[in-house]
């Protein structure tokens, strides 16, 4: 079977990439631009593993937030009223409108479309005009959240509710990185796109 006949995911295609450095070959070019490859990475890596989202110093106070898109998911990373760091969906549960942009500070999250308002923990607290809807319970419509944990000043998120805790996932990295005092580092420059 020729290389061109093999699936992009066929392990045989990548044997040479794991050879000793003096014998190794690079990854095939299509892994860098294939939508099929990207989709597989999203499902097998980015939706299952811990991902760095921001730094704790970017959201030092209650109400501070950073709005991000991670694997096509609109998220807001924020510090709630109790100082807990949370990762919430940035799409309103009513009509899917974008709730926030950029970064800043807020006391609540309010949708610009119909003014649904959420507490900083994601709880739906105000729904103008919904009082007329039968059987509507605000408690049934919080903002979806993803796991958020911190280490070394970094805020990590994970879309997989069953993933191992962050520190367990980091394994020996925590000890190896200890001399670098990551928690003392500060963001001094951001890449604006």
At which residue positions do the language-model features occur?
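Rieske [2Fe-2S] iron-sulfur-binding subdomain
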Residues: 1-84, 105, 118-193
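N-terminal pre-triad scaffold of radical SAM enzymes
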Residues: 72, 87-91, 98-99
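Basic side chains
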Residues: 79, 93-95
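Short beta-strand
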Residues: 102
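Cys/His-rich metal-chelating microdomains
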Residues: 95-98, 117
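Short cysteine-rich clusters marking metal-coordination/redox-active sites
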Residues: 92, 111
């Amino acid at each position: 079977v020729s290389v061109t006949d093999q699936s992009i995911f066929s392990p045989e295609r990548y044997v040479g990439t794991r050879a000793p450095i003096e014998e190794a070959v690079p990854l095939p070019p299509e892994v860098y631009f294939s939508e099929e490859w990207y989709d597989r990475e999203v499902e097998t890596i980015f939706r299952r593993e811990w991902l760095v989202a921001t730094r704790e110093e970017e959201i030092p106070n209650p109400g501070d937030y950073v709005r991000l898109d991670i694997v096509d998911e609109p998220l807001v990373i924020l510090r709630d009223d109790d100082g807990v760091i949370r990762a919430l969906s940035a799409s309103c549960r009513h009509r899917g409108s974008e709730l926030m942009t950029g970064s800043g500070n807020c006391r609540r999250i309010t949708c610009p479309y119909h003014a649904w308002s959420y507490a900083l923990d994601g709880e739906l607290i105000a729904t103008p005009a919904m009082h007329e809807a039968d059987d509507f319970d605000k408690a049934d419509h919080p903002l979806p959240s993803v796991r958020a944990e911190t280490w070394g000043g970094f805020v990590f998120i994970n879309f997989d509710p069953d993933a191992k805790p962050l520190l367990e996932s980091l394994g020996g990295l925590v000890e190896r990185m200890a001399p670098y005092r990551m928690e003392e580092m500060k963001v001094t420059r951001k890449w604006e796109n």
